[in-house]
């Protein structure tokens, strides 16, 4: 999970929100 966070921090942020939303801006 730590590695995934380093690769896609924005994606993890959305997941932490409680919703699985891919925020790729």
UniProtKB/Swiss-Prot annotation:
Keywords: Antioxidant, Cytoplasm, Disulfide bond, Oxidoreductase, Peroxidase, Redox-active center. The active site is a conserved redox-active cysteine residue, the peroxidatic cysteine (C(P)), which makes the nucleophilic attack on the peroxide substrate. The peroxide oxidizes the C(P)-SH to cysteine sulfenic acid (C(P)-SOH), which then reacts with another cysteine residue, the resolving cysteine (C(R)), to form a disulfide bridge. The disulfide is subsequently reduced by an appropriate electron donor to complete the catalytic cycle. In this typical 2-Cys peroxiredoxin, C(R) is provided by the other dimeric subunit to form an intersubunit disulfide. Its EC number is 1.11.1.26. Belongs to the peroxiredoxin family. AhpC/Prx1 subfamily. It comes from Delftia acidovorans (Pseudomonas acidovorans). One of its GO terms (cellular component) is cytoplasm. It is found in: Cytoplasm. The lineage of its organism: Bacteria, Pseudomonadati, Pseudomonadota, Betaproteobacteria, Burkholderiales. It catalyses: a hydroperoxide + NADH + H(+) = an alcohol + NAD(+) + H2O. Homodimer; disulfide-linked, upon oxidation. 5 homodimers assemble to form a ring-like decamer. Thiol-specific peroxidase that catalyzes the reduction of hydrogen peroxide and organic hydroperoxides to water and alcohols, respectively. Plays a role in cell protection against oxidative stress by detoxifying peroxides. GO terms for molecular function: NADH-dependent peroxiredoxin activity. This is Alkyl hydroperoxide reductase C. Its main location: cytoplasm.
């Amino acid at each position: 999970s730590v590695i995934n966070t380093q690769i896609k921090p924005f994606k993890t942020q959305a997941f932490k929100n409680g919703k699985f939303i891919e925020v790729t801006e």
